[in-house]
Amino acid sequence: MTARRVANASGPWLAAYQKARERTETLVKPLSEADQTAQSMPDASPVKWHLAHTSWFFETFVLKPNLPGYSAFDPAFEYLFNSYYNSIGEQFPRAQRGAITRPGASEVLAYRHHVDKHMTQLLSQLSPELLNSLDTLLPLGLAHEEQHQELLITDLQHLFSINPLYPAVTLPVQAFAPVAALGWWPFPGGLVEIGAPAPGDASDVHVDDSPSFRFDDSPSFRFDDSPSFRFDNESPRHQVRLYPFALADRLVTNGEYAAFIDAGGYNEPLHWLSEGWAWRCREQISQPLYWLRRAEQWWQYSLAGLHALDPHAPVRHISLFEAMAYAQWCGCRLATEFEWEHAAARVEPSDSVYDPTILAPQPQSQSADQLYNCLWQWTQSQYQPYPGYRPEAGAVGEYNGKFMSNQFVLRGGSCITPPNHIRASYRNFFPAATRWQFSGIRMAKDD
């Protein structure tokens, strides 16, 4: 994780903090107390827990060590809302977070406001020395808040999908136009540079006197094309040898994936990894998550409610196992994360608008290639450290590195990913069976 020094930082950092926190609360305004408390599965967390945990992060890593006289809102929250930081202390079991009926939503909101009040106090009196000590923690805390905005949405959608009323809490989804036949971008291979540049590199120059988290006053905000923050797992920058390959020029659509289903793709073990086939059989998987078959027609649930499946929209909520099976059926494969980054680094992320009132892929908000801002794209690469990787010192070193086992990398960001996280070097990661994230398929092949 790196951050460039900023001048006169108190005002911009305070504004960035307030905007990030306000945006989280904007997402939950339509929700009831029950909506915020329930938990649909062990991998998901209640909305209320996300609201509290992000406050716990600022309280634990920023306020307690740096604001003299700070008093915790409730000492018991250190146990309730610690996620996985073993060096901080024990945690309440993740799979039982839905049992935390108290504190209620109003008390969690009071906790957030308590933390906000004291963060405002701290950020209003930043000295050069304090800024120097917080130049990693402040951007990390904001990035962490934004990551939980996306997780909050995916967890809420999974919860609502179980409800037979299929609640709608956002504007209707818009139909995609028919797509052209799949095309391919060829790449010759060779030695390529992968990873985020180190601070001070020519590609890392930044002269703005404000933080990299850029906000405006509207419900939507636009991507800042020069973010200064990088997670530690995006570094060090290093060379990788690529062999000639081609990358598909768009994502796989619902209609194309439905053809895989109609062809018996879920029943043909030759398409599947051994572990994927065992998962498919054990869980009785026969279509993507949130697809329903009614009256000989496919339907899909989203936070806009239940609607007829759009055959031209990109297929989403797909596991790595399903993505690999589909690619095998097509005679293709998934890209490695290095192939994806090499291709995507040549494309500027679109000046996309993130809108919390529309939480599904939208045809007008993406470039035709759908590299960024549409769906997270599975790669065949296992999540591993780059050569020379070193986690951050102290408890925040548990943020990324300790999860580099039994997970696969996704790239590109989704329609619900905050724009500060949209960049070629960003590495998301999940276990291969994960489906409740906004994940899709981009194929590759040897050239």
Predicted regions and their residues:
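Secondary-structure boundary/capping signal
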Residues: D35-Q36, S127, L334, D351
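Helix-capping and short linker residues that terminate individual alpha-solenoid repeat units
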Residues: T120-S127, E348
